[in-house]
Amino acid sequence: MKRKILLITAILLVAVLLAGMVAAYLAAAAMYKKSFNYRCTTSVSDRYDIEKFPAMTRSRHTFPTRQGHLLTGYLYGSADGAAPKALVVFAHGLGAGGQTGYLPIFDYLVQNGYCVFAYDATGNDESEGEAIGSLIQGYIDMDYAVTYAQGLEETAGLPLVLMGYSWGALSAGNTLNTHPEAAAVVTIAGWNRARDLVEDSTRRKMGKAGNLVIPFISLYEFVTYGKYASSTAMKGFERSDCGAMIIHGELDGTVPIEYGYDIYAAKYENAPRFTFVRYSDRGHVNILPKSSTGFSGELLAQIVAFCDKWVG
């Protein structure tokens, strides 16, 4: 009789424990979804008109991402029909909308011999998706964007450069895991792993209790995103032998430099294929200084010189 009571007690304890874990998982999943349950639209003040860049043409494209909804992208090329030396796939940041806010960068790259494929990520501007979904969604979208862009007749056989700002830089580094054939990658104010900023935000909001929630957030990401959930830029650097240019500002309060640049430099600072650009006086937004005509050409010139070296 005593053994039977112990067995029943053990079963009840296991049931309560499992119920608690399921409840914690569902709560973490709901919190996670709520955090990314919004769309982003580029404001009028941040949007650039293609007509202001007469040296550049573009063609509109749509392609499906992993969930099946359609993303919108544009292939930018030279108005004089000059053959490009390489294809740059560019991923935008999070919060200000899609790719249309970066046209001066594309124009600079095009005038220096590159074609650029830039797209609106899930839940941004012209792309489908009720919400952005997650930070991981960024490099899922970039994976599919690269595959699509490489399949275009205009880009056939061109060396590939992955490039992005902030969330897009996270995506660019992580996309090396699925596209290690890239000749070069340029990350501007990015970081290593999507979960790092999610964990940081969770701890700031919940204090020590956040440490109890984080494992369930990780489980939700794995269940939802599969192989992409365990991706990191560091793994991408190990999979590829491409050139890597890492750009960051020490004053960045949005993506702290220790979440990306410092991690990469600890291993690769003396590696010949890595170029590190660290600014002591720049933060997140002003990492690419703006002039009256768009983005300052100082850093863009460094980026082009770096890419030229790696695309041959």
Whereabouts are the PLM-identified features?
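Catalytic nucleophile-loop/oxyanion-hole region of alpha/beta-hydrolase
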Residues: G98, T122-A156
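C-terminal catalytic histidine-bearing segment of alpha/beta-hydrolase fold enzymes
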Residues: N270-G312
